């Protein structure tokens, strides 16, 4: 998959993506991932402003939340259309003084950013679109400030795609194929996306000189609720249930998305709250 092809997908799909984030499933993905992230954020210090980087920031939904916490945030994306939406959203939120917009390719972080510059790095729903996710993680590792800095990665979970095909779509052939597939088809942008397992994630983090300190599941059951349950009206209850499921080892492995938190490999390994 070429970088240009990916850029075109994001550029042409920017408005559709913004609309998706307003739907319950889009809100849940963003809200749950951010709630998980808050458990691992470095402590804010009055005398020091933390610096964050959002790789593949999209419309800036998560980055702007970090800016509201007082962080200085660099928003990096390959799509000018996405960055335009992020800029407008930042203006509406009144945080333009806290953000820097940067057009660039996630696989070229080492040439775009100074080393040891960021306390928090996000890479949410980016790696599944790329042929070389290790290049992104190597660049992110280089950009982490020190052993206390945190990297949050959100990816599409292979097990979740099996359940989606079988339960939501009722397509047993695709479900069976997804049991071993490295790639699947997605509908938002159109085209293929990489599927990850816990083992494959551990391997690419290790290759990037990073150590995973925790894994969380994002959207474990919400996608499969019957029609009588309104995702809009019952949003808060669904959110709270998902939060409880996200760290439970018997449930999280079948979530639609897997969220990993990592530090530089020399850091001590300890789970969060």
Model regions and ranges:
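Conserved class I S-adenosyl-L-methionine
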Residues: 1-56, 61, 65, 85, 150-179, ...
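Short alpha-helix
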Residues: 192-209, 215
